[in-house]
Amino acid sequence: MEDFVRQCFNPMIVELAEKAMKEYGEDPKIETNKFAAICTHLEVCFMYSDFHFIDERGESIIVESGDPNALLKHRFEIIEGRDRTMAWTVVNSICNTTGVEKPKFLPDLYDYKENRFIEIGVTRREVHIYYLEKANKIKSEKTHIHIFSFTGEEMATKADYTLDEESRARIKTRLFTIRQEMASRGLWDSFVSQREAKRQLKKDLKLQEPCAGLPTKVSHRTSPALKTLEPMWMDSNRTAALRASFLKCQKK
């Protein structure tokens, strides 16, 4: 699984996932399923944000190519992917600027159009079960929840899906592609089942050999949001990143 993750995801996503795991004392080489899950979640958060802006009238617009007008403001502030200290700094800055209630837990995004924090979920299980788990943990109506599954299902607070259908379809397609790529390499079952994952881990540790059949090339095409990893994510210089294209798994 580790080799698959490093081949399938953008190197910047992989690096962020590694840092996040190490921050909590976890080893990506051992907890490979969690490594894959974190990379997937990061990519969904970035795709959620990509290309969405607010114009001078306060309307949400999509700009997919070229440099948008400097007056445009990014609709979403990305919080996921930061170390905890910087993430809370961003959250506090947003709360002080907008007057919204500070969340108890770190959210993934902030939506400047709807003036709300967003919690993104990506699940291998039933979306409604994962949604309820998120809601019970957060216990706040102020944070919007949006759950995606690898089967194309989704669930959001009050059925408000925030994004347009095409933008959500991109995310669903990417998740389905990841599932298919895992399945073709015999990794999906262990990714879904903890029991199977433990069995696979013991086998991998015993063999200590790289997985066969993995693609030999890594895509270095960077999602626009990945180019925004500066100390604070609130300036308009991020717009030049729109020239980049979405990352996709490369097949051998």
UniProtKB/Swiss-Prot annotation:
**Domain text:** The probable endonuclease active site in the N-terminus and the basic amino acid cluster in the C-terminus are important for the shutoff activity. The C-terminus acts as a nuclear localization signal. The C-terminus is recruited to host protein complexes involved in nuclear Pol II RNA processing.
Q: Where in the cell is it found?
A: Host cytoplasm; Host nucleus
* Pfam family for this entry, one: Flu_PA
- What protein family does this chain belong to? Belongs to the influenza viruses PA-X family.
Give the source's domain of life in one word.
Viruses
**What is the protein name stated in its UniProt record?**
Protein PA-X
A single BP term in Gene Ontology = viral RNA genome replication
Record-marked site positions (Important for efficient shutoff activity): K202, K203, K206
Q: Which residues form the active site?
A: E80, D108
Q: Location of site Important for efficient shutoff activity and nuclear localization?
A: R195, K198, R199
Keywords from UniProt, A to Z, are: Decay of host mRNAs by virus, Eukaryotic host gene expression shutoff by virus, Host cytoplasm, Host gene expression shutoff by virus, Host mRNA suppression by virus, Host nucleus, Host-virus interaction
Among InterPro entries, the record links this protein to:
PA/PA-X (IPR001009), PA/PA-X_sf (IPR038372)
Q: What does this protein do?
A: Plays a major role in the shutoff of the host protein expression by cleaving mRNAs probably via an endonuclease activity. This host shutoff allows the virus to escape from the host antiviral response. Hijacks host RNA splicing machinery to selectively target host RNAs containing introns for destruction. This may explain the preferential degradation of RNAs that have undergone co- or post-transcriptional processing.
Gene Ontology molecular function: RNA binding
